[in-house]
Amino acid sequence: MSERRNTVVELLGENDVSRTVARIAHQIIEKTALDSEGADRVMLLGIPSGGVPLAERLAAKIEEFSGVRVDTGAIDITLYRDDLRNKPHRALQPTSIPSGGIDKTTVVLVDDVLFSGRTVRAALDALRDLGRPNYIQLAVLVDRGHRQLPIRADYVGKNLPTARAEDVTVMLREIDGRDAVTLTREEGEGDN
């Protein structure tokens, strides 16, 4: 019988995560024309749990780089998930939408990892119940591939092609006490 063990590799460290967030903030400024008059009102809505602190960080960087303060909030997708039958006991997360709502705005959904696309699909369904933005965009720190739905991020910090069996973990100082992105793979004796 072969012994299985997990190997954890740090792919992004503290400085890498910081640079990546700054780069995404610059891209949002450019694509949404935030620094020009007449641009849509832009808001960043984080998908709990990792997307919420990322949205706050992006908003701070956008303000630092452009002088424009964008609204932030959180959108709970729990009741919109398509796996509720498999995992029925999920804690509801708070939804907080900036005053004025989402109608006629550019909403940038923010999440830490894009994988199957199902979380984003649930967020799109939740948004539909809250109003009608002019545009919906997606910003993710990590895109690891393996989509099950036709969903693509507008802003990607790092593309990390992975095997389906590998796990990508995003650690954020607001939640985990430090910033890092790690890859965990299970290996057994004789694996190379």
UniProtKB/Swiss-Prot annotation:
Signal peptide: none annotated. A motif (PRPP-binding) lies at residues 107-119. The keyword Aminoacyl-tRNA synthetase does not apply. Regulates the transcription of the pyrimidine nucleotide (pyr) operon in response to exogenous pyrimidines. Also displays a weak uracil phosphoribosyltransferase activity which is not physiologically significant. One of its GO terms (molecular function) is uracil phosphoribosyltransferase activity. The lineage of its organism: Bacteria, Bacillati, Actinomycetota, Actinomycetes, Mycobacteriales. InterPro entries: PRibTrfase_dom, PRTase-like, PyrR, PyrR_bifunctional. Belongs to the purine/pyrimidine phosphoribosyltransferase family. PyrR subfamily. Keywords: Glycosyltransferase, Transcription, Transcription regulation, Transferase. It comes from the Bacteria. SUPFAM superfamilies: PRTase-like. It comes from Corynebacterium efficiens (strain DSM 44549 / YS-314 / AJ 12310 / JCM 11189 / NBRC 100395). It catalyses: UMP + diphosphate = 5-phospho-alpha-D-ribose 1-diphosphate + uracil. Its EC number is 2.4.2.9. It holds the Pfam family Pribosyltran. GO terms for biological process: regulation of DNA-templated transcription. This is Bifunctional protein PyrR.
